[in-house]
Every structure is written in C-alpha cells, then in structure tokens.
A protein has these predicted regions:
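An aromatic/glycine/proline-enriched structural segment found at the starts
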Residues: 5, 48-52, 87-152, 309-340
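M16 family metallopeptidases and their MPP-like homologs
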Residues: 1-5, 19, 23-25, 34-63, ...
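A generic secondary-structure signal for well-formed alpha-helical elements
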Residues: 4-9, 26, 98, 106-114, ...
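Short beta-alpha junctions and helix-cap segments that line functional grooves
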Residues: 103, 118-119, 130, 163, ...
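Conserved, carboxylate-rich catalytic/transport cores that coordinate ions
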Residues: 77
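PEST-like low-complexity, intrinsically disordered acidic/proline/serine-rich tracts
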Residues: 13, 25, 29-35, 116, ...
Length: 340
C-alpha cells in the first residue's frame, strides 16, 4: 500500500486502457435515459464552472478524458497526496499499539507538504420555472427529474432530513413509490436523494414512468413535493411506521467492517463530530413529527424546482407544455440547449 501511495507509476498502457474504458462508460451512460439525466442535471443546477457541475455519474466528459495524460496524473498526485492532508482509516482486529509501528515503518519517510486549498464555491438558489427536455426517440418510458439546489451538509436538521428522505423516496413503500408504483402502476420505482457534500447539495427526485403518463406523473410528483414540504407533513401512523423501520435496523447498522469504514469516512469527509455515530441511535429515537416537518421545510422547496424529462418528445412534449411549469428548453445529450 505504501509503495502505491508514495511511488505511483501510472503505466502508459494502463492509462490508455482506462481512458478507453471510461469513454465506453460515458457512451453507455448517454444511451440510458436515467443516467444521461444524472449526467446533465448538475450543470442545470450549478452552471458549468462550479466544482459540482460534473456529471453525478462520476465519469466526466469525453473531452476531458481524452485530454488527460500520464504526466497530468503524476502532477495531480504530487500536488494532492500529502501526509498532512491525509487520513488513514483501519477497521479490524487491530490496536493502535500494533498499528503505529507498521505505519511508521511504511510511511515514515513521507515528507510533509501543504496541498492547495480547494474552493467549492457558492451557487445561487435554483430559480425554478424551467423545464428541460431531452429526446430519446421510441423510449418506452420517460425519466422525470425534479430538482433544486438545497442547503449544505452539516446542519442540525440533517438527521431528521435523512428520515424524511427514506419515507419520501428511499424505500419501496415511500410516498413516491406508493403513489406512482403501488397505487397507479405507472412506474417500476422512484427515488428521492440529497447526496452528502460539504457545499450546497442537490435535492432531486427521479421517476421513470410509462411514456403515456408523463404529464400526469409530473403533476403527482409536484403534489408530493408540496405535500412533504408542508401541505401534508409526515405525521400520525405514517410517522410511527417510518420510525419503526428506521430504529429496528439500528442494531445491525454497524455489524460489518465495511459499514464501520464507511461511517468513519463520513466523519472525516463531511466534518461530523467524532461521536456522531456513537450518538446516532439515540438521536434517531429522539426525532419527533415537528423535527421532520421542520427539516422538510428547510431542504425541500417546491417553488425552486427545475424539471428535466428524458423521453420520446414527439409523444410527450405537448402534454408537458400544457402544464405551463415554465420556460421549455430542449437539450442535447451533453446538456446544451438546442432551442433556436
């Protein structure tokens, strides 16, 4: 491990191979309605210059992949891999007394060096009133995305919002799934997410639906967003059910080394207190209906929603325009406007 960290080689043939693989992955993502939506969405929310503007899939763009050289990788490693900017996380049957001598032997010669400071940047609130369309001729489904920029991580309401998300779009019996899948049979499954980050996070709903229910499903998604944000807060038996679901799973949450490792990574990367997960179960059990309602109001803002629909536009565009949700912009698969 130390040799890889301290003396990376980046063989030219393997760099070329990985670039080909990454380009192939990008092509596959663009061919799939759901993943092409997740590629485009960040630029619609953050613009093109923000640190979070890159595709949510993590694969980048063809032009940037093509431009990367072996020298770029070596330069990046020299710049960012520093001991005083690193954290080593070890999980297993080992003590610090056993671990420290081995670490000193392996990494003791790694000279301290300051890495540049990263600037995440700010971003304006989503203005809403925009509907973006991407054509996928003959697609049997439309992928509907409703999204906006929300608050940064590390707020007091984070834990309550985690619980809201589970009941809104994080389970097979969540509100979105009960509506679009179980009740109406328009979708195989929906998702609501708010990925963790240090800067302003995206909140988004992804709802693949049968194409002939695109317009109607957008109406239902908008209704559910208004509901959870205040018109119909989580309460009563619905609240009790989600709390039972969340608390019954707590004892086994950290049964594996992988789970412990992920928790430690969260603490380091997101700036959580060291005792965040030690107090996690207690804090979850202390949540009440008001805490969930307050969190939903902080993080979910229906008036700021930006819409993105990927589907067969010759079949669905007219119905979408009838909703009068705002300016309609057609995009290509790279997220650039094709409006004349």
């Amino acid at each position: 491990m130390a040799d890889v960290v301290l003396n990376p080689v980046y063989p030219a043939d393997l760099v070329a191979l990985e670039k080909r693989r990454q380009r192939s992955q990008i092509g596959q993502e663009k061919a799939d309605p759901r993943t092409v939506a997740l590629r485009i969405l960040p630029r619609l929310l953050y613009g093109t210059t923000h640190a979070y503007a890159n595709p949510f899939t993590g694969s980048g763009d063809e032009s940037t992949v093509d431009a990367i050289t072996r020298d770029d990788l070596l330069r990046w490693h020299r710049t960012w891999f520093t001991p005083n900017g690193s954290t080593l996380i070890v999980t297993g049957d080992v003590t610090m007394a056993q671990l420290e001598p081995a670490l000193n032997a392996a990494f003791g010669g790694w000279a301290r060096k300051d890495a540049p400071k990263k600037s995440i940047g700010t971003v304006a609130k989503s203005a809403g009133g925009k509907v973006y369309l991407l054509d996928k001729p003959d697609a049997p489904q439309s992928v509907i995305v409703a999204a906006h920029v929300t608050e940064r991580g590390g707020l007091p309401q984070d834990l309550a919002m985690e619980t809201v998300l589970r009941n809104f779009g994080g389970m097979s019996t969540s509100r979105l799934n009960r509506n679009l899948r179980l009740d109406k049979h328009w979708s195989y499954g929906t998702q609501a997410a708010m990925p963790a980050s240090r800067g302003p996070r995206p909140f988004y709903v992804v709802a693949p639906v049968q194409w002939d229910k695109t317009k109607e499903a957008m109406v239902e998604v908008a209704k559910e967003l208004r509901g959870v944000a205040g018109e119909r807060p989580l309460a009563g038996e619905e609240f009790q059910s989600i709390m039972r679901n969340q608390t019954l799973g707590l004892p086994g949450r950290f049964d594996t080394l992988d789970a412990l490792e992920r928790a430690a990574i969260d603490i380091v990367s997101l700036g959580y207190p060291d005792d965040y997960y030690a107090n996690y179960a207690k804090n979850v059990r202390a949540l009440d209906e008001k805490a969930l309602a307050d969190a939903a109001k902080v993080f979910i803002r229906p008036d700021e929603i930006v819409w993105l629909v990927v589907g067969d536009l010759k079949k669905v565009e007219a119905g979408i325009r009838e909703l009068k949700l705002g300016e309609v912009v057609r995009l290509d698969e790279s997220g650039k406007s094709t409006n004349e």
